[in-house]
Amino acid sequence: MSVSFLFPELSTTGTIIDGNSFLLESNKRWPGSKALRWREYERDTDVDIIINPDDMAVTVSHFRDDKLISADGALDFEEAANIAAWVRSLNPDPNLVLWFTTSVFDGHTVLTPGITPHQVIDQWVDHTEHDPYIEYPQYFH
């Protein structure tokens, strides 16, 4: 089973970016990628971007609630950190509570405006050492 990388917005009021803007920004970031649009009854995502569709593909997905973006496929932690920094750049609002984590929720990085891929990696917090449910109770009720 592969581990997906997640970029959730954790507050009750914020959003990352709408699907149309995500599609536009993705096409700028990854020219030549393949875009898939989905209807509400088909999937939880409304836009999937397939990077390197003819090779080791990576899918970056936008969820229709505008509060989650995920990345899955043939990518390592460093590539996921690059995507995380890009996702944060989509919405520079300093009040946006955006994290980078995995589908197994074994750690996280708080994505602050202007964060670099190197900082995403360096600021990773291991959940075996820091319990997010205790340290961030406002996001987990």
Q: What function would you assign to each model-found segment?
A:
Residues I50-H141:
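Charged interaction segments
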Residues L36-A57:
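Amphipathic, interaction-prone secondary-structure segments
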Residues M1-G32, L36, Q138-H141:
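Short, extreme N-terminal segment that most often corresponds to the first beta-strand
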Residues R29, R37-R39, R43, R64, ...:
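Arginine residue identity/basic-tract feature
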Residues K34-E42, L98-V104:
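A generic structural motif
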